[in-house]
């Protein structure tokens, strides 16, 4: 399976890193981090995003967001699934309105036109009517809208356990088997 992980410049970059860390090793992963993602990672978490990604998944293929001619920008390359974690509202708007001027939005547009799973984890609060309309437009185009919302029923005691719940739910939405969180009724 081939999966693209897009990392936009929204708050919550550690969630993308946890997704990358927990992704099963047999999945071929392609990563595109926006310029703003690198800035936000450093400002919010003191993380050098380039180094962190390579440390977590040395076998991944990394692309520059401006490399619009990359293999993953074409439907014929055969990417199976894509996740954008976190998804800024700027990125959401670009995808919702068909703008593909960078590799993340172009790859997302390809997923929509090819009717392949595209998971979007929007990071913003509160949401304006415009933001909600853009998310609704994407949902109507079969994108999976999966914001990182906390859980209480798992009784998570650590930040890592909460992150694992989110990553596990995202994996579930993408059809990736996992045991990252306790299932309801399975205790």
Curated annotation (Swiss-Prot):
Specify the domain of life of the species encoding this protein: Bacteria
Recorded GO molecular functions are: flavin prenyltransferase activity
Question: Which cysteines are disulphide-bonded?
Answer: none
- Reaction(s) catalyzed by this protein? dimethylallyl phosphate + FMNH2 = prenylated FMNH2 + phosphate
Per its UniProt record, what SUPFAM superfamilies does this chain match?
A: Homo-oligomeric flavin-containing Cys decarboxylases, HFCD
Enumerate the Pfam families for this protein: Flavoprotein
Give UniProt keywords alphabetically.
Answer: Flavoprotein, FMN, Prenyltransferase, Transferase
**EC numbers, comma separated:** 2.5.1.129
InterPro entries in alphabetical order? Flavin_trans-like (IPR036551), Flavoprotein (IPR003382), UbiX-like (IPR004507)
The residues that the entry says bind FMN are 9-11, 34, 123
Q: Which residues bind dimethylallyl phosphate?
A: 153, 169
Q: State what this protein does.
A: Flavin prenyltransferase that catalyzes the synthesis of the prenylated FMN cofactor (prenyl-FMN) for 4-hydroxy-3-polyprenylbenzoic acid decarboxylase UbiD. The prenyltransferase is metal-independent and links a dimethylallyl moiety from dimethylallyl monophosphate (DMAP) to the flavin N5 and C6 atoms of FMN.
Family to which this protein belongs: Belongs to the UbiX/PAD1 family.
User: NCBIfam families in the record, alphabetically?
Assistant: PRK06029.1, ubiX_pad
Q: What is this protein called?
A: Flavin prenyltransferase UbiX
| Species this chain originates from | Helicobacter pylori (strain J99 / ATCC 700824) (Campylobacter pylori J99)
Instruction: Quote the gene name from the UniProt entry.
Output: ubiX
């Amino acid at each position: 399976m081939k999966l693209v992980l897009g990392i936009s410049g929204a708050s919550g970059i550690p969630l993308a890193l946890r997704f990358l860390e927990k992704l099963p090793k047999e999945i071929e992963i392609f990563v595109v981090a926006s310029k703003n993602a690198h800035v936000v990672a450093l400002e919010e978490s003191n993380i050098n995003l380039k180094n962190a990604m390579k440390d977590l998944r040395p076998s991944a293929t990394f692309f520059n967001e401006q490399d619009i001619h990359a293999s993953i920008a074409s439907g014929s390359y055969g990417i199976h699934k894509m996740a954008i974690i976190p998804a800024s509202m700027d990125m959401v708007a670009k995808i919702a309105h068909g703008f593909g001027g960078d590799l993340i939005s172009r790859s997302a547009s390809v997923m929509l036109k090819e009717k392949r799973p595209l998971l979007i984890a929007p990071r913003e609060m509160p949401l304006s009517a415009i933001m909600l309309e853009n998310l609704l437009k994407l949902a109507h185009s079969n994108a999976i809208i999966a914001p990182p919302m906390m859980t209480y029923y798992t009784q998570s005691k650590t930040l890592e356990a909460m992150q694992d719940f989110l990553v596990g739910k995202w994996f579930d939405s993408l059809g990736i088997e996992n045991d990252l969180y306790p299932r309801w009724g399975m205790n």
